[in-house]
Swiss-Prot record:
The keyword Amino-acid biosynthesis does not apply. Residues 49-139 form the ATP-cone domain. Residues 1-11 have a biased composition (Polar residues). This is Transcriptional repressor NrdR.
Amino acid sequence: MRCPNCNSLDTQVKDSRPTEDSSVIRRRRVCIACNFRFTTFERVQLRELIVIKRNGRRVPFDRDKLMRSVQISLRKRPVDPERVEQMVSAIVRELESGGEAEISSETIGESVMDHLRKLDDVAYVRFASVYRNFREAKDFEAVLGELSHEDEARAALVRK
């Protein structure tokens, strides 16, 4: 592992431990050349995914880009970062285990929206507004109407 401080390849692992859901290994490292300490995270990659963009271009799947877009939708929301990490890991696992090496950006977007809907309504609406390219207030009203209808249906089930 290359040191982010001095670019030396001579680093040493001082501590390794799994995260809470055991999907990632956290490693504390130290650079032998400059004594800089840093942390790395390792996760299993089941397959190399290719994303088919709306314009037809094919690009490598970028987990960090997915995480950034989810974090933007969750900005200033009271959601534990560990739950966000678990959600993104679950989305990636679903995509990797889907059997296809190439997946559409629409498939990814729909998966993110499904997971965000369960995690935080505000983040779901924020993500949907960008993903579905909302242009007018009625676009927001339609999504909010869907959410309130789902809430009413859930409440009716609880009362039974």
